[in-house]
């Protein structure tokens, strides 16, 4: 995400070795300082994604493992298939953009596509068609998927920040017999 609000964090899902992410990854559609734009969904290789994040933005990544029952796993797979039906493939531009330090570089979406074996999609319908940092954001998509496993924690107002989601996962990890079974820092 290129918005000023990406500083508050970001939530991705990893399922079967593929990272699943949602955000405003098309700079040509950004408005309101990156707060609004086309909703882009992508799937990419987990290990290559971790390497890209560490190299590009020196991010600290927190990974949580969730133990899914066969029923939960089936529900997650159904939700992923349902979401994918609401999209069309999207190829990010190969044009370089000016970075904060004045240099030219490929967009984040282009790097995801070409450096992490990424598949990118734009939503053509549903609430995810337009990304909005305060409501239709990365946490909403993650919770739409992971909520199928019984972790539906969105606030009644419909907004939850990435840090709140992380705090929930930390609390669950500390509980005995929780479905959150592991935590890793990358």
Please provide the spans of the model-predicted regions.
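Active-site nucleophilic cysteine motif
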Residues: 7-10, 128-163
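C-terminal or late-domain output modules
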Residues: 147-186
